Amino acid sequence: MARWPWRWRVLLPLLLLHSSPVFAQEGQDNDPSTLFKRASEMMNLRKYDGSLGLLNAVLEVDPNHSEAYRQRASVLRHKCRYKEAEGDYSKYLELKPGSSSVEKELSQLLQAQNALESAYGQFESHDFSKVLEYINKIVLVFSPNCLKAKLLKAKALLALEDYSSVISETGFILKEDEDNLDALLLRGRAYYYLADHDVASRHYQKGLRLDPEHSELKKAYFGLKNLLKKTKSAEDNAAKGKLRVSAEDYKAALAMDPDHTSYNVHLYLGLCKVLVKLGRGKEAISSCTEALNIDGELVDALTQRGEAKLLTEDWEGAVQDLKEASQKSPQDMGIREALMRAEKQLKLSKRKDWYKILGISKTASAADIKRAYKKLALQWHPDKNVDNREEAENMFREIAAAYEVLGDEDKRVRYDRGEDLDEMNMGGGGGGFNPFGGGGQQYTFHYDGGFYGGGGFPGGGFPGGFQFNFG
């Protein structure tokens, strides 16, 4: 107990020293003039909540303080509490009727109120540009601290995909109220659509810590979590060679949010690569085209689409895509190699397909080639096609030229490799091979003037007149 007197001896002089100013301040706080002056200072500093509290105190002490009503009406208008503000303006005009300046402020209030209502209506009609016009040109001019208008503006900007502006606008809101759930949600969504998923997730998580049952925050947070999980599954399965499973994972991820273009561009590209490996060229082209519709400068998507077009034998399309990709990335040897393959295939596609002319596959044996040649030569001999002689002559030449190449093992190998063959050597006779010789049957063709086209059958000119003999 002896300690307490000692403490009082130390503390009592300090209490007495500070008590007079405290009590004096309490007395000053009840003075309407002092309170009003402080309220005006706080309003000038845009500390509207503090100013509003002081003005409430003024009017409690002096219910007829007209300037306090006007000042409070102005604060309430700034915060878009229009009905309360209208009541204070009306009270001021009761105390001081005929004030043109206050009547003007009241008119501005009604104008801002109507504009805010119109902005909400335009938002429901999805005319988001009109929403911004009402808010920027009217509401925030007369009510610069209107939280409802700022949040509606951020929502309109989000709908217009102006994500950077959403981040900026919600940043101002969170600076004044760091726990504003609507602002946290909108800002998180803006970062999400910019594919900055880590920052988006942090905003969602902060909001959920404040309100774990907030339905929109929960939907946004778990939606993002599931999207990233499905993407990882697609990438992991592709790396393991489980291409069909990977393709289904990519498709599932793309279905989660079709509007998430900044992220979906990578999903489309990943899907395209998997489909190319699966040999599903048509689907791959579609997927890569979706990626390029989002980002036309994506070289990897151009390259993969070129590869996909090779699968569908769209040689010209493949060359076009790969050439563009090569121009954008001239040092990439992989692209250059793919372009060379495409150009070679395009060149090959423009030459005659001798296999097709003889109606045989590319794996046909020498005997198959000879058999097909004999059959077609008999079928299209001009003497047997008097009614369509010109067509028969052309077909006869084609058949002979095809056999000139495919009936010669060396020429066939070179042809299959895609090498250029001297077309002059393809069209006429000049070898020493008679495909109709030997084998127990003798084929003699009679045609006045020799072989059509000036060459004769491959393996000889067969000049003069001769006829079919089946011996």
Swiss-Prot record:
Keyword Nucleotidyltransferase included in the entry's annotation: no
Annotated compartments: Endoplasmic reticulum lumen
Primary localisation category: endoplasmic reticulum
Keyword Signal appears in the UniProt entry: yes
J domain sequence ranges: 353-419
TPR repeat residue intervals: 32-65, 66-99, 112-146, 148-180, 181-214, 227-260, 265-298, 300-332
Superkingdom of origin: Eukaryota
Transmembrane regions: none
Keywords assigned by UniProt, alphabetized: Chaperone, Endoplasmic reticulum, Glycoprotein, Repeat, Signal, TPR repeat
Pfam assignment, any one: TPR_16
Functional description taken from the UniProt entry: May play a role in protein folding in the endoplasmic reticulum.
Subunit structure: Interacts with BIP1.
PANTHER family in UniProt: DNAJ HOMOLOG SUBFAMILY C MEMBER 7, DNAJ PROTEIN P58IPK HOMOLOG
Protein name: DnaJ protein P58IPK homolog B
Species the sequence originates in: Oryza sativa subsp. japonica
Organism phylogeny: Eukaryota, Viridiplantae, Streptophyta, Embryophyta, Tracheophyta
